[in-house]
C-alpha cells in the first residue's frame, strides 16, 4: 500500500482538487494524509471531508521588499523541518502538492528526504511554490493546456 501525503491550502482553489484527489486515491487503496497550515481553509474543510490533517507553520512569501521578507529564511527553515517530521511520521512514499503556503515547505522536505514530488497546478498562471518545485517534481499536471511550467502535462481538474 502506498502512503501519499497531499499538501495544499489557503483557498478552495487548492483544497477542492486536493480533496477530490484524496478521495480518488483512497478508492484505489492508498493511505492518504494531508498537510496544511492553521491560516487556510484546509483547517476546516479537510477534516470535514474525513481526511487526516497535520499542521505546519505558514510561510507567506512577500511580493515586495519589506521587513517580512527578511523573516522568510528562518520561517521556511522551520516549516521545512516540521514538514519533514510529518513526512517521516506518515512514512510518505510520495508528496502531491496543490499550491498555497503549505506546499513549498512540503516540497522542499520531500526533496531533502528523496521522496518523489507530484504537482497539480489549478491556475493558468502558476503560483510561486509550484513554479519552484516544478523543476524537481517527477510529474507536473495542469488544469489548463498552456500553463507555463517545466514538464507540464495537461490533466484537467480533479
Tell what function each PLM region has.
Residues 3-9, 28-78, 84, 155:
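Conserved nucleotide-sugar phosphate-binding/catalytic loop shared by glycosyltransferases and other
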Residues 6-14, 94-95:
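Short, glycine-rich nucleotide/cofactor-binding loops
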Residues 11-12, 16, 100-102, 124-128:
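Residue-level detector of alpha-helix initiation sites
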Residues 13, 46, 99, 140:
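Residue-level signature of catalytic and energy-coupling elements of molecular machines
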Residues 14-25:
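Short amphipathic alpha-helix
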Residues 25-26, 110:
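Hydrophobic alpha-helical packing residues
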Residues 31, 41, 52, 111-158:
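Active-site-proximal region of nucleotide-activated glycan assembly enzymes
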Residues 82-95, 102-118, 131-136:
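Glycosyltransferases and closely related glycan-assembly transferases
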Amino acid at each position: 500500500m502506498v502512503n501519499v501525503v497531499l499538501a495544499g491550502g489557503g483557498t478552495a482553489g487548492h483544497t477542492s482538487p486536493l480533496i477530490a484527489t484524496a478521495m480518488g486515491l483512497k478508492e484505489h487503496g492508498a493511505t492518504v494524509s494531508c498537510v496544511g497550515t492553521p491560516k487556510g481553509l484546509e483547517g476546516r474543510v479537510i477534516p470535514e471531508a474525513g481526511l487526516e490533517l497535520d499542521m505546519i507553520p505558514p510561510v507567506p512569501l512577500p511580493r515586495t521588499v519589506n521587513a517580512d521578507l527578511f523573516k522568510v529564511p528562518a520561517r521556511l527553515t522551520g516549516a521545512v523541518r516540521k514538514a519533514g517530521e510529518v513526512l517521516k511520521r506518515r512514512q510518505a512514499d510520495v508528496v502531491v502538492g496543490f499550491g498555497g503556503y503549505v506546499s513549498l515547505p512540503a516540497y522542499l522536505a520531500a526533496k531533502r528526504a528523496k521522496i518523489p514530488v507530484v504537482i497539480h497546478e489549478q491556475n493558468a498562471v502558476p503560483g510561486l511554490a509550484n513554479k519552484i518545485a516544478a523543476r524537481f517534481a517527477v510529474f507536473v499536471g495542469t488544469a489548463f493546456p498552456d500553463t507555463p511550467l517545466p514538464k507540464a502535462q495537461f490533466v484537467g481538474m480533479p
